[in-house]
């Protein structure tokens, strides 16, 4: 009997020992906090010049051998592939696998890669490393693994859901964006990826962030689906004071659209990864800010307490809006951030940077807190990131939203029925929504409008749009000084009931 008791105790002890070990964000946070207390050491590149100086076309030739995907021989729906170092991805990133009992470094091997026509000395690459990784999952078809996550460059990552193609990017952290001192780009220097079980439908990734003035520990839980959701937890530590901290940053591209048409003839009516910033403020207000490609750097701030959500969206999915068979902007996802817990007082900030082509990301959006702790103190941020093509789902059904913003030369119809330009700028704003569609066409919908000191609203009228079953606002505004920006706001109401989100537009200077 005593022998059986000892045997039972031994089994219980074994179970306890095996279940008590678990890798967590706290393990990464210890490293981040330790780094924050030390001086910053810039990463050193170990790349041969043939890789460091290569052009993008050459870098694209270095392809991962898909038959050597990590976890290929395991019964798990997730697979990993890796990015080779090259071009400006010139420093190695450590990548580890976390199992139920241990942490193991995933070792680099040139055998993972096909180098194409890139001429190189095989001896010089044998001790290199990875620049990042991608996650594959059968998201569109059960018998085909598609790339759903890409972690490459600084703290950038891209995510897609079913039927989507890569568009905008998310980042771990942004520092001093759009400040005269220049932006600092933190980087993920090491990753830990949990080996998923055969039945797992989610993948957990940990990351250690480092930069001259900040460190951080991150936990990403990736849940693929029609909308792919990433659950994010971060613990951030400042090494030194920063001018501005950008939390949950998103990076996108806007070249032109109907609110700011292409200056040259283009068969594509619109060209952008996102066309607006959507905000659900702490007080419940919904705000829509159409994006611009300004001639000068522009920063817009929306002060609030405890934001309920914000994101860069791609509203309007018809192929006819883009007409691009190669880059399929109509399939690029919107990204929506839902904070968890109270984020306190701060601002959702939008940065718009001039660009001449679509290869440059020129749009940044993030949350920046009003108060930052002293260096070394921990900051915690939790939020979900949803990548979706279903923009209706990212908005309250009882609140109509802006379907499109179109800009035109303002004019007045003469007695001879010919339209004559009158020196104004016209805006056509279409509002739609689930509840709005139920309103009778003769509902007395009106607009509440306002404009900043640099402009004057010459005319404002609202009419029912039978095509969209929504309402169309038509504005004519006169700008006083074209060298300055002009701010406008509008929302639809029915008596004392607000029917729509707030259209918040900035007409760029020198337009």
UniProtKB/Swiss-Prot annotation:
Known pathway: Glycan metabolism; osmoregulated periplasmic glucan (OPG) biosynthesis
Signal peptide: 1-22
Compartment list: Periplasm
Family from the record: Belongs to the OpgD/OpgG family.
Source species of the chain: Salmonella paratyphi A (strain AKU_12601)
Cross-referenced PANTHER family: GLUCANS BIOSYNTHESIS PROTEIN, GLUCANS BIOSYNTHESIS PROTEIN G
Any one Gene Ontology BP term: beta-glucan biosynthetic process
Molecular functions per Gene Ontology: carbohydrate binding; catalytic activity
Domain of life: Bacteria
One term under GO cellular component: outer membrane-bounded periplasmic space
Function: Involved in the biosynthesis of osmoregulated periplasmic glucans (OPGs).
Name of this protein: Glucans biosynthesis protein G
Chief subcellular location: periplasm
Alphabetized SUPFAM superfamilies for the sequence: E set domains, Galactose mutarotase-like
